[in-house]
UniProtKB/Swiss-Prot annotation:
Protein name (record): Thrombin-like enzyme TL-BJ 1
Regulation: Inhibited by PMSF, but not by hirudin.
Family: Belongs to the peptidase S1 family. Snake venom subfamily.
Hydrolase as UniProt keyword: yes
Organism the protein comes from: Bothrops jararaca (Jararaca)
Record's subunit section: Monomer.
Keyword Glycoprotein listed: yes
Any one of the GO BP annotations: proteolysis
């Protein structure tokens, strides 16, 4: 995750669930 922002991580988790 670029930046390491909590919001960014949260979005990344959603994408991970989709994949």
């Amino acid at each position: 995750v670029i930046g390491g922002d909590e919001c960014n991580i949260n979005e990344h988790r959603s994408l991970a669930l989709v994949y």
